[in-house]
Structure formats: structure tokens, C-alpha cells
């Protein structure tokens, strides 16, 4: 949120399943809650089959350009952008051609490649996401009051700090196979 409306591409990076997509979903909701019209937000998860025909950056550029709001800033939120070949060319063109604020996630190896770094040098900021720390893990999960701090730490060591694990019930006496 601190880089919102700054003329830099915001690249959310982190290991797989650390919550990058969830962060973008929360940001989308934040925009709506703060008065941004839904028509001024384009949020696409490019792994969805809905976008299967957008693998070429020119087709992708045309598709998105047709949907950019005619007035006011448009927020472009792209998840798993690396599925678009030469996506960095489309992103730079959006920056140049429209009043947009751009947020992207995807595979670290593709997003921070040399070609991309060269094209957008000085025009992007990386937002690194890490798994939850032990303190965040304690704040994030609900444990029964009778579970000791040692047992909670063992759960943290066993399962790590991935937000998806919130779906598991650590209080139940059952084995979770990873």
C-alpha cells in the first residue's frame, strides 16, 4: 500500500505458496473499500483457462487495453504473469500509454530475469514476501488454550510458516501428512 499510485511497477516475489496471490486479493479489496470503482481494477490470474488465448504479449496488451478505464487511474493486478511470452514489453507499454498502477506476481526466476531488469531498470520495486515468522504464525493460527508454546513451536517447525496451512486444524488429534 505504501507504493500505491507511485509510478513504479510493483513486483511481489516469494517462494511458492507464501501468500502472494492472497496479498493481491487483499489489495484488490482494499482498493474497493477505499472508493476505487470495480471498473477501474483489472485483476487477472493468468493461470486460469479463462485467459488461455493470451499467451502472446501483443494479444495480452490488446485485451487489457480494451478494458482500461477511459477516465481515472486503472489498477492492473496480474497474477502468474510469466505465462505471457515477453510480458515485460506489454507491462512497459501499459506504463507509457495509460494512467495505470501495476502490480504483478509470478515465478521469481522469470520476473526478475536479466531481460526484464534491463527493460524496466529503475521503474519497478520488488515487494518480497516471506513465510510467516514464529510470532506471525502464533498470531495467524488459532490454538486451543491448553497447547503449550513448545507444542506450538513444534507445529511451526513441522509445517512451516505457509498461510495456506490455516486450513488445517492444529488442535485436532489427527495426523497431517505433508
Which residues are covered by each model-predicted region?
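Hydrophobic anchor at the beta1->P-loop junction of P-loop NTPases
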Residues: 12
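Interdomain hinge/linker elements that couple catalytic modules in large macromolecular machines
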Residues: 135-178
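Conserved lysine of the Walker
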Residues: 20
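Hydrophobic positions on the alpha1 helix immediately C-terminal to the Walker A/P-loop
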Residues: 23, 27
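Short glycine-rich substrate-engagement loop in P-loop NTPases that contacts/grips substrate
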Residues: 42-74
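Phosphate-binding P-loop
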Residues: 2-7
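Structural recognition of the conserved hydrophobic beta-strand(s) that form the central parallel beta-sheet
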Residues: 77, 101-107, 128
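Short regulatory helix/loop adjacent to the ATP-binding pocket of P-loop NTPases
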Residues: 110-126, 141-142
Amino acid at each position: 500500500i505504501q507504493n500505491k499510485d507511485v509510478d513504479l511497477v510493483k513486483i511481489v516475489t516469494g517462494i511458492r505458496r507464501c501468500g502472494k496471490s492472497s496479498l493481491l486479493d487483499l489489495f484488490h479489496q482494499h482498493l474497493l473499500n477505499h472508493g476505487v470503482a470495480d471498473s477501474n481494477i483489472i485483476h487477472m490470474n493468468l493461470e486460469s483457462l479463462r485467459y488461455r488465448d493470451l499467451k502472446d504479449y501483443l494479444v495480452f496488451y490488446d485485451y487489457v487495453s480494451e478494458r482500461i478505464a477511459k477516465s481515472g487511474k486503472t489498477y492492473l493486478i496480474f497474477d502468474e504473469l510469466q505465462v505471457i511470452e515477453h510480458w515485460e514489453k506489454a507491462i512497459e507499454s501499459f506504463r507509457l500509454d495509460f494512467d495505470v498502477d501495476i502490480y504483478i506476481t509470478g515465478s521469481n526466476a522469470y520476473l526478475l530475469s536479466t531481460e526484464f531488469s534491463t527493460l524496466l531498470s529503475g521503474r519497478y520495486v520488488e515487494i518480497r514476501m516471506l513465510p510467516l515468522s514464529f510470532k506471525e504464525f502464533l498470531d495467524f493460527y488459532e490454538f486451543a488454550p491448553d497447547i503449550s508454546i513448545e507444542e506450538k513451536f513444534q507445529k511451526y517447525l513441522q509445517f512451516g510458516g505457509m498461510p495456506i496451512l490455516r486450513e488445517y486444524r492444529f488442535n485436532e488429534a489427527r495426523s497431517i501428512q505433508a
